[in-house]
Amino acid sequence: MTTQAAEVAKRRTFAIISHPDAGKTTITEKLLLMGKAIAVAGTVKSRKSDRHATSDWMEMEKQRGISITTSVMQFPYREHMINLLDTPGHEDFSEDTYRTLTAVDSALMVLDGGKGVEPRTIALMDVCRLRDTPIVSFINKLDRDIRDPIELLDEIEAVLKIKAAPITWPIGCYRDFKGVYHLAEDRIIVFVPGHGHERIETRVIEKLDSDEARAHLGDMYDDFVEQLELVQGACHEFDKDAFLRGEMTPVFFGTALGNFGVDHVLDAVVDWAPKPLARVANERTVEPAEEKFTGFVFKIQANMDPKHRDRIAFMRICSGKYEKGMKMRHVRIKKDLKIADALTFFSSEREMLEEAWAGDIIGLHNHGTIQIGDTFTEGEVLGFTGIPHFAPELFRRVRLKDPLKSKQLRQGLQELAEEGATQVFFPERNNDIILGAVGVLQFDVVASRLKEEYKVECAYEAINVWSARWIECSDEKKLKEFKDKAYENLAVDGGGHLTYLAPTRVNLSLMEERWPEVKFRATREHH
């Protein structure tokens, strides 16, 4: 096996998806703990030793305690290299989250055992389904009261339309939580609560049909055996091929806070989740084992280093190897760049990188030339597909408090739009600036970042826009007619694309009927 093939085979790149408060930040920290990447989970101290969770780094996140921005963490585990992408868990999240899911090969779904499947989980699963992403499931919070586990599995199947195959099964919950039973291996993993940074030695009872198991379960033993027979009769057996096709999810139970069960999930990612997969470009399919370097940018983030107004472009390597000082072709702008200072990530600890392989995520310093969706190669003209822009669902007009700062406002919004924090529209008929977002929190994020990073204070006003659609039309004459007729509602977005801002759903339907030659698109690929 070549070094390259061996390095690719070691990689596992996955994201965590969940509804807010299902325990995603806690599980992220416990995973880092498994990889010995942090000594004390959740209390990585900065110099001032103020304690805040490792993966939530922007000012606003610190105040609200939610991971607004996607961070990337790399750590070793069992001779493998794990790349973990954290997605914003707040109900108000942006396209950032969707795009992060285009950069991974599998996902870990975290469900709150007391609540089951929640709306955000459904939305994220829809995105995973588009790409048949393999999903490992973790039902969390067994140290509290949870719903009937069989009911939870039924709900996963009915609502998320994926077969659920339990790998472990909980023995009791809350104060009666005794551990989990591993169905295939016929053994009990005993629950010993371990908080924070403690890595507890696990106690295992081999065989359910044993005196030791009877003693541990006590009065619960007979009921548990009966429940297990029911489960084994009713549930799917795990089928790795169905998992890799995105049709079945292995389900684990545990408590991230109690530091129990997280290792079972990480083992599943290593043992079953795919190594870096081939990627589709417009021109051809790119295999990870190819010698030549290729990669695409799925996210841009400003100011990871408060001392520098820098912006980092996050790139997923699709093939070949990154080496410090190598030359790359930036395909969209047809320029060669020498990259000497790519970064690897351990949350906000950033280190310079000597080499990286397919499946890894690296950070490039961006001085305004890199956009989301850009492809980098060693010279070949390629464009990776499937990195979408979604039509925003909420709109506000921006009002400047100091009219002399309109230049800074435009620059700030342009940069925040390139980063994917918001979408910006400039109407044809006036000098308004309209912001579009997927969730309300995005407007707060933009206002606070304009103030902190660009020293611009702005206010928002309601505006009569229901939705935005990107316009495409191959017939020049028809397009001109359309532009003349629809002038009042036309705008140009931050990337220079013609956009129709529909005041109502009815208006949009009428326009689509009236102009069959014009395509009104709700998503747009990054080009």
Curated annotation (Swiss-Prot):
Keywords: Cytoplasm, GTP-binding, Nucleotide-binding, Protein biosynthesis
Disulfide bond residue pairs: none
One Pfam family cited in the UniProt record for this chain: EF-G_D2
Gene3D superfamilies for the chain: P-loop containing nucleotide triphosphate hydrolases (3.40.50.300), Peptide chain release factor 3, domain III (3.30.70.3280)
Gene Ontology terms: cellular component: cytosol
Family the entry assigns: Belongs to the TRAFAC class translation factor GTPase superfamily. Classic translation factor GTPase family. PrfC subfamily.
NCBIfam families: prfC, PRK00741.1, small_GTP
Function per UniProt: Increases the formation of ribosomal termination complexes and stimulates activities of RF-1 and RF-2. It binds guanine nucleotides and has strong preference for UGA stop codons. It may interact directly with the ribosome. The stimulation of RF-1 and RF-2 is significantly reduced by GTP and GDP, but not by GMP.
Protein name (record): Peptide chain release factor 3
The species this protein was found in: Stutzerimonas stutzeri (strain A1501) (Pseudomonas stutzeri)
